[in-house]
């Protein structure tokens, strides 16, 4: 199965957000059904997790919460939704026989990845809040974690949105030139 994700190098909560995308002008949900979930679990390197309707519902809920929190930091309802997801699990620290270990415990296995995504979002909010951004591309709904040195990444990808923006600017300039000349 080819990787269906539009951006392969993003952290889990951003990966989750980017399951809602626009392809060929249509809104697509990579997590529309259990088959989609199975493919996505493989793509994010977690093929061992069961692709179940309950897991799908948990990820939908986490996705809405992550989106709400990122789109509007003052959205209390989104914050409560995220906290409800986080409430379903915890990370336990222990010294295992192979050394220090941190074990994620969830009440219901279906919540595991949703919990991990919410927890990873907290980590990103602690250190990199301003580097979690939506693509500036016209009609693009993708998000990214800007890990560039300058912290000025604008586009999900230079090859798509970046080039389209450049072409539009160029087009606007040449139209300008015609009007003046
Ligand atoms: Zn984009």
Stretch-by-stretch model annotation:
Residues 1-134, 138-142, 178-181:
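Short helix-coil boundary/hinge micro-motifs
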Residues 146-153:
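Short linker/helix segments within small regulatory modules
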Residues 130-137, 153, 158, 164:
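Residues immediately within or flanking Cys/His clusters that coordinate Zn2+
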Residues 73, 147, 162:
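Residue-level signal for short amphipathic helical patches enriched in basic/charged
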Residues 159-178:
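Basic DNA-binding region of bZIP-type proteins
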Residues 93-94, 148, 169:
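Short amphipathic alpha-helical interaction/hinge segments
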